[in-house]
Structure formats: structure tokens, C-alpha cells
Amino acid sequence: MIGSFRDLGRRGLFLLDPETAHGMSIAALKSGLVPTCRVSNDPRLRQIVAGLDFANPLGMAAGYDKNAEVPEALLKLGFGFTEIGTVTPKPQPGNPRPRIFRLVEDEGVINRLGFNNEGHEAALRRLQPIRGNGIIGVNIGANKDSADRIADYVAGIRRFYSVARYFTANISSPNTPGLRDLQARESLSALLSAVLAARDDEAAKAGKKIPVFLKIAPDLTEEGMDDIAAEVLAHALDGLIVSNTTLSRDGLKDQVQAKEAGGLSGKPVFERSTVVLAKMRRRVGAALPIIGVGGVSSAETALEKIRAGADLVQLYSCMVYEGPGLPGRVVAGLSKLLDRERVASIRELRDSRLDYWADRKV
């Protein structure tokens, strides 16, 4: 049923501009029009990462459910976890439209949304009534006009502490001017110190410690990766998400849309993001949790991220082309791949192709 929905839905949605289509997909999930997917609870896929119990390693990346409108509906598609946001303290409209572009030949997407969202309070109101064991992460960012961006991240930690299962500090979007400057070593040190101090303060009050991840860009030099790894380890951060969208346009077939400004995601970013993932795994060692994201379109590509060093994986853009049945197919496909590999846990395959990916150039 989901397969036929995918084919009909894609044809219909692709007649619309991408942002309108996205809004309609959110509305469909809200109204229950999208069929749910019952994935088997394969114990081999279960992971304990950063103290959280994931039924399977596949998550919905931030960017789809910016305003926490459909986290529970997304979990019913087969995802083991989902991440809302990016949310900023104040509502902001983002950049002018058009700001999302499909690269159909490449199965990629370029966006220059600019953290458009309804702000902390709107997302918090939607998250507070949610009950259940589903893992919902909160991706936090800074307002475009903020005079103190680090304070915006601290505000996100404090505001969502009662509802987040984990936090992601997003400092890697290319669509907010100057945001990626927070990846520079001195700025990153100040950010991590402030964010983790706020987390520890809230943890002392709440009696629970919520893990904090850092989402980084794929457009990093070797020196830049060295600096990030050093600061992450020095501050005892809980984990990394590798990676956000890229500014690179290497190898694209659609040279017309490729000229649009913004971050590229989907299948074209798989290789670059996986190389950076492996290089970061090599730098931070075996213990630090890493979530791999970028170009995951199948069980095979999800497993390749894990082989390159990821504990968990996320997807988003490839669902634009594959439809809402994709997470269920990926999870079922991972079980079949584990049958073939004859392993008791998917964790046994982590890092099995680390050197292959880490030795490649970005």
C-alpha cells in the first residue's frame, strides 16, 4: 500500500513547488493519510547510544519537521528516532522564496531556507503533551539577527530540557550568514563550554542528563576536522552528527539548478559526508557516538555509514524521491543484510570499512 502511495504521491507532489509539496506532506502526516509502517523489532538492530535505547538505528534528520508538528507520525513510519527543528528562540521567516530546488536527475535537493521556524514557544507547546517512549531530539540554532548566538543555543537547552531526549547544536547550516564561523576552534570552545554548562545546570535540577550532539558541515579541511575533534574531546561532548549540507556542486548532472545558492543534500552528498564521517571517527576514537547523515537512500547506504564509523544514521532528502515507505524499507533491508553477514548485532559491523573511507580525500 505504501508503494502505491509513494508512486501516486510523488507524481502529485512533484507538480507543486518543493516548499508547497513539503507543507502538504506535513498536512498528510497530521491527518493520518500516510499509511503507517510496522517494522519488526529485530533485536540485532537495537542500539544503546549516549544512554538512549534505540529500537533501530535509523532516524529522521532535522529540517523536515521544523516546528515539531509530526514527530509521533514520523516514528510510525518505521524510524527509530526523529529530530525536530532547527528551532530558534524567536520565530523567523527565513530567506525569500523560492528557496528549495529539486535536482531530479541527481536525486538531490538544494535549500537556502535560513532556519525558518515558529520559534521555541510554538515547538515547546507541541512537544509538551507527547507521552511515550519514542526518541525525539531537538535541534537548536541561533536567530539570524541575534546579537549573542551562543546565548541562543543556551536558551534552547534550557527551554526544551523537559521534553528533549537529546539535543543537537546546529552550527553547520550554510544559510545563516556567519553561522559556520562557530566551527572555528576558539568560537567552538566558547559555544561548547556555555552549552554544556547550561545542560549540566539543568541536569542538576531535573535529575537527568540529556545528551548533547554537535552537527558539523562536510566542507571542512583536515585542519578544521582536527580542531573540532580536539574541542569535542576536551569538552567531553556526548556525540557528533556528520554531516549537514554541502556547498560543493561536484559531479552534478543538473547544472541549471546547481547554480542556485544554498546547501546540497540527498544522494550527491553521500560520498563527501561519509568520508568526513570516517575521518572524524578516526580522530575522536571508538567511544564517542556519531550519527551519520547525508545521502542515505537504502539499507545498503545506511549500513555503509555504519561501516564507516556511525553508530546511528539519519535521512531526509532521499525521502523526497522515495516517499514515506523509505524508512520501513531501510529497516527491513538492514535485517536482511544482517542475515547475510551472520552477525548478532549491527554494532559488530561498525568501523569495518573505516580505513577505506577515512583514507579518501574530501
Curated annotation (Swiss-Prot):
It catalyses: (S)-dihydroorotate + a quinone = orotate + a quinol. Its EC number is 1.3.5.2. The keyword tRNA processing does not apply. It is found in: Cell membrane. Pathway: Pyrimidine metabolism; UMP biosynthesis via de novo pathway; orotate from (S)-dihydroorotate (quinone route): step 1/1. Keywords: Cell membrane, Flavoprotein, FMN, Membrane, Oxidoreductase, Pyrimidine biosynthesis. InterPro entries: Aldolase_TIM, DHO_dehydrogenase, Dihydroorotate_DH_2, Dihydroorotate_DH_cat, Dihydroorotate_DH_CS. The active site is at S173 (nucleophile). It is a peripheral membrane protein. Signal peptide: none annotated. FMN binds at A62, G63, Y64, D65, K66, T86, N139, N170, K215, S243, G266, G295, Y316, S317. It holds the Pfam family DHO_dh. Substrate binds at K66, N111, R112, L113, G114, F115, N170, N175, N244, T245. GO terms for biological process: 'de novo' pyrimidine nucleobase biosynthetic process; 'de novo' UMP biosynthetic process. The keyword RNA-binding does not apply. PROSITE patterns: DHODEHASE_1, DHODEHASE_2. One of its GO terms (molecular function) is dihydroorotate dehydrogenase (quinone) activity. Binds 1 FMN per subunit. Its cofactor is FMN. NCBIfam families: PRK05286.1-2, PRK05286.2-5, pyrD_sub2. Monomer. PANTHER family: DIHYDROOROTATE DEHYDROGENASE (QUINONE), MITOCHONDRIAL (PTHR48109:SF4), DIHYDROOROTATE DEHYDROGENASE (QUINONE), MITOCHONDRIAL-RELATED (PTHR48109). Belongs to the dihydroorotate dehydrogenase family. Type 2 subfamily. This is Dihydroorotate dehydrogenase (quinone). It comes from Rhizobium rhizogenes (strain K84 / ATCC BAA-868).
